[in-house]
Amino acid sequence: MSRFLICSFALVLLYPAGIDMYLVGLPRIAADLNASEAQLHIAFSVYLAGMAAAMLFAGKVADRSGRKPVAIPGAALFIIASVFCSLAETSALFLAGRFLQGLGAGCCYVVAFAILRDTLDDRRRAKVLSLLNGITCIIPVLAPVLGHLIMLKFPWQSLFWTMATMGIAVLMLSLFILKETRPAAPAASDKPRENSESLLNRFFLSRVVITTLSVSVILTFVNTSPVLLMEIMGFERGEYATIMALTAGVSMTVSFSTPFALGIFKPRTLMITSQVLFLAAGITLAVSPSHAVSLFGITLICAGFSVGFGVAMSQALGPFSLRAGVASSTLGIAQVCGSSLWIWLAAVVGIGAWNMLIGILIACSIVSLLLIMFVAPGRPVAAHEEIHHHA
């Protein structure tokens, strides 16, 4: 079992590493490529576009051909794209490399969740996804620090060589450690069950909406945090870094505590707790009389996301024994596109950073609470929780 967990964790971590590792080198990259920092900030969106594009086909291929045939090319593409970015001499080539990086990371991301669905039952999967969420929270803190240390001695290209090295590690794990987990092709008698695993299932769609709104909350916070903390609240850059590190610490602590909470409380209870924390955060930020109270509201955001996201993802994947790859792709596409669409629309309409965050917090909590309370699984967990690998 440990081989599947290690490989899944490694496959997922390429995604946040590709986002956060290069940011510290952005000024030097812009200078060397004769581009403005504003022009290169689109590299974030290009990377996410690559991920979304990969998810359009990766899940279906993983269900038809296997998990390894998607993970291995995905890791290889991430390596090649990282090297391509390091050798880029124009901003256009650099952005093309970032898109290819996103394609590779997207393939690996989809496979990771499909593997966990193949190998873990609902309760264990919820615990593991909560742990994975905690580990993922470390990357936005450690990656810029590692990037800064690298750039003290080496040029910005070394950041992408570091990412390529990470990709090589994932490729080696996928080649030599990961075992295939895709369930055997269904017999004719199983075709009705395969056809019953519909993406239009009400319960699945409700969890798609809940996880997409939750990701929109956390990405809105990350995107607006410089404006909120430095421009509106007046913190210095060093203080901003400290606050973000502390919020990551809150996320990790709650994520690592959630598996223990699942041994005491029902998953539904934790999901309701998550949304109540979001609602409390939105109200706190809306009526906050001081910076201290606002910072408390921000910690509620991190705690709310960490306590409920892994549980919701686990529930979303639960009904899909034979189509876990497609389900994982659908979740990823919805989360990436939905959150990006909200942030873009809010900016176009002219909603300020503060109101943007408060709005998504309150909307997410109200909609999600209604879905949790009124959309129940269509059949008992035991009816669809088939695990294909136990060791």
Curated annotation (Swiss-Prot):
It is found in: Cell inner membrane. This is Multidrug resistance protein MdtL. Pfam families: MFS_1 (PF07690). The chain crosses the membrane at residues 4-24, 42-62, 69-89, 93-113, 131-151, 158-178, 203-222, 245-265, 269-289, 293-313, 331-351, 356-376. GO terms for biological process: response to antibiotic. GO terms for cellular component: plasma membrane. Confers resistance to chloramphenicol. Coiled coil: none annotated. The gene is mdtL. It is a multi-pass membrane protein. Residues 1-3, 63-68, 114-130, 179-202, 266-268, 314-330, 377-391 are cytoplasmic. InterPro entries: MFS (IPR011701), MFS_dom (IPR020846), MFS_Efflux_Transporters (IPR050189), MFS_trans_sf (IPR036259), Multidrug-R_MdtL (IPR023697). It comes from the Bacteria. Residues 25-41, 90-92, 152-157, 223-244, 290-292, 352-355 are periplasmic. It comes from Escherichia coli O6:K15:H31 (strain 536 / UPEC). Belongs to the major facilitator superfamily. DHA1 family. MdtL (TC 2.A.1.2.22) subfamily. NCBIfam families: PRK10473.1.
